[in-house]
C-alpha cells in the first residue's frame, strides 16, 4: 500500500530575504538567503565585484540536504561577527553542487589534491580570476582541538592577500594549469584482466560477516554491485560466479535488513556510519534509490527470480520514489537527514523523523494482537526495539539518538514467528499493519526538508531503475511510471532539442524554470540516453531510439574531447578548466555510461562511428583501466561489451504478435550480459537502416534473429523454437 509523503515544505522567495540568493530557485541557495552574509550566486556580478575591489572570493559549495552544511551555516554563516569579516574583506559566493557539478568538481579536485580529502560543505578561497588559493571542507566556528576556526582562517587569508596578493594570483594561475585533465591515450588491457582485478579487489575487501566492502562508513555503491552482477553472469557457473553471487546476496540482504533501509518510510538512506548497516546518515537521495532499484532488479533476474524478499525490496524502493514524485511525472532530488524532533522544537536533529522510543511504539500499537501474541511484542522482537534504545554511543557521538531505536531486522521471519508461536503469514500481516500505524504517526512529526529540484541526469537514472524493475517482475506499474517520467522530461527539461540541467517546484505546485540559464551537463545527456535506450529495448517505440540518437549527436558536439566527455560545455567561460571525471563513485561518470550507450547504438544502427568513439573512450581511460580498474567498474563493463561483443536480438514484425510478446517476456526473465534488442516493424523504422537489419526487415514476419558478433542464427518463426534458442544461454 502506498503511504503518502509527509507534507512538503517548499522554500520560497519572500520580501524578507536579506541577500541576492532570495532571487534564486535552488532550495540550497534559498536556505542561505536570510544569512547576514552578502552572498552572491555564481556569476559575472560576483566576479566583477571581486575584480573591481581587488578582493578574494570565498566560495562555499554544498547542497540542501547536507548535514554538515547545515552545521556550518548555523555556527558561522548566521554569526553576525563572522559575516562582517566576510562582507568587509571577501566576495562570498554560494553554489548548489547539484545545479553546478562543473564548479563543484573543479574545485573539489583542488581541495582533494591539496588536503588529501574532500566533502561538503566545500570551502575554497579564490582570486578574482577564479584561481584557487587554499581550501577545505567544514571549518569550526572557533579554534579548537588543533583546528583553526573559520574567523581565524578568514583573517589569515585577508592578511596574506593584503601582503602577498600578486604572489597568490600567480600561484593560483599555476594551480589551475595543474588541474587541466590529461589527454593521453593508449592501449587497454583485455577485459578479462580488468574484470579479474576488480573482482579480486572486491573479494579481498568483502565483509563476510556483515556484508558490504571495506570498513565503516559503508556506502551502498551501486556501481560496484552492478559490476559483480555482470561478472557473475560472464563467469557462468564457475566458482568465481558463485562467490560473486554470494557477496551480492549477503550485501543486498544485509542492506535491506539494516537501519540504512527505512522499514517504515521506504527507500534507503545515504550510508551506514558503522559496519553493521544499522545507524545511517539519514538523508535520502534520488540517485541512490534509482541505482539500487536497478541493482536489486538485475540481481533478481540473475538469480532467476528465486528470492521473494528481493522482489519486496524492489517494490519498497518504488513506493518511496512515488512519495518524492511531482504530479506531472518528475522525481525530486533528495530528502534531508535533519528535522525538528517535535513542533515545539527550534533545533533540528539528525534522524528525528525516523527513530523511535520503545514506549512510543508501545502506545501506538496498544493491545493489538497477532493470533494470541501481542503485536507490540512481535514488532519489538522483529525490529530489535530495546528499552534504552538500540543505538550504540559510538554511532551517535552527539547523543542525538539517545534512548532511540533505529529499526532493523535481525531475525528471519521464521525465527520471529516461532518465537511468538504464530505462522509466518500471520507475522507478515501483523508487521504490515504495524508499519501502517507507525507511518501514520511519523507523518504527524515535523517533516524533513525536501529538495524539490528535479535534475535531468537523475530522472534518467530513475527511468533506468524503473525499466529494470519491470523487466525483473513484469509488473506494468514500473514501466508506466518510467514512461511518465520520460514524458515529464520531454515537457519540462527539453529545450528545443537540447536539455536543461534542472527545474523546480513552484509555490503553486507547478514546475518552474530557474532564474539562471543552467544548461545540462554531460551526465544529463549520458544518463538520459541510457534511459531512452532502456525504454526502447523494452517497449520498442521508435521515438525513444530517435531521441537517443539526437541527444547523442548533441552530446558529442558539446562535450567530446577526443578521448571522452568533458563535464561541461566549452561555451562556459566562468569555469576555467573543463574537467573529465575518472571515477565511478556515488554516480557513474558520463564517459563510462556514454561508452556503453555508443556500443548499444552501434548494435542497433550498425554504424561503425559509434563503436570507434567507444574505443576512444577506453583508450582515453587506459591508464586508469590498466592500473586501478576498481575506479571505473561501469566502464569496465562497457569495455567487456566492446571486446567480447554483444548478443543482439532482432525482433521483426508486429510487436503484439504471440512470438514477439513471448520473446520479450523471455528476455525479461534472464540476465544477459551485453544484450541489445532491435525492434523492426517496417522497413521505414530507424532501426532498419543498417545493412543486415534492412535485410531482416524485408524477410518473413514475425521473426526473431539472434546475432553474436557478425554471425546471426537462422530466424525463429514459431514459439516452439524459442526454447532451443534460449537454451543457448
Curated annotation (Swiss-Prot):
Which cysteines are disulphide-bonded? Answer: none
GO BP:
carbohydrate metabolic process
Pfam families given in the database record: Thioredox_DsbH (PF03190)
Q: What's the superkingdom here? A: Eukaryota
PANTHER family tied to this protein: SPERMATOGENESIS-ASSOCIATED PROTEIN 20 (PTHR42899:SF1)
What protein does this entry describe? Uncharacterized protein B0495.5
